[in-house]
Amino acid sequence: MKAERDPSGARRHRWPAPLAGAMLADPRLGESGPELFNPAHYGERARPVDAGGRQAAWFVQGQGWQGVLRRYRRGGLIARLSRDTYLWAGEARTRSFREFRLLAAMRAQGLPVPAPLAAAYWRQGPTYRAAIVVERIPGVRPLAQALAEPLWQPVAEAIVRMHRAGVWHADLNAFNILIGSDGRVWLIDFDRGTQGGLSDRQRQGNLQRLRRSLVKVAGEDGERFWLKLRDSYWTAWGVGVQP
């Protein structure tokens, strides 16, 4: 496979038939190929992620790196028709390449997101399948498991930083916010996320999605956490506490 340089800084490899696809890979991964996206390739160094991922995510370990491999899967009713294929609209619009490039851009801006390690798509006629590998952050737990702790301010500040960078998260919930052992906040899962031209409505939508998630996870305790997070968000945004 001949490698090209992607604007994200990754190496871009195009696969010949019959694979009919391409991949992006961090130079740290060396001369890697499609095997990166096959859990069987890692043997005992791969294990399923306990929660989320629609049974399509694994913790994997390579030579000098640890990551999370995720295959893109549909949810909801449409999954009954097509579990893992998407309509082809050009390479730049594949879910894997878009998420990889968004994460790379966010990392370059110093935002608290995992490093993208590799992304791929496999095209078949008018459809394609896709997968991504992102850096595994050691020693973290989801916000959903830490609501008894006074974390609303650092969580709010992380969201404000994301929004100030013009980034919209497609599913900001209590499991896509991770808390490190040092108290650092990380934001994950930017599938379908975008950057640029973030509207007030999109920001409010992110916040309300998180509120629903917190209440679903912890009921009244989740609502109390949300109210403190909301006030911290608006204070960090610079407009003071909002009603």
Each language-model region and where it sits:
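Conserved catalytic-loop position in the HRD/HxD motif
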Residues: 166, 171, 189
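Juxta-kinase regulatory segment immediately upstream of eukaryotic protein kinase catalytic domains
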Residues: 1-47
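C-lobe/activation-segment region of protein kinase-like
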Residues: 180, 185-243
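Conserved ATP-binding subdomain of kinase catalytic cores across diverse folds
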Residues: 32-141, 160, 164-165
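Short, basic, helix/turn surface patches
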Residues: 138-151, 219
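Hydrophobic residue at the +6 position relative to the catalytic HRD Asp in the kinase catalytic loop
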Residues: 172-179
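Conserved alphaE helix
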Residues: 150-158
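Charged catalytic carboxylate motif
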Residues: 98, 154, 209
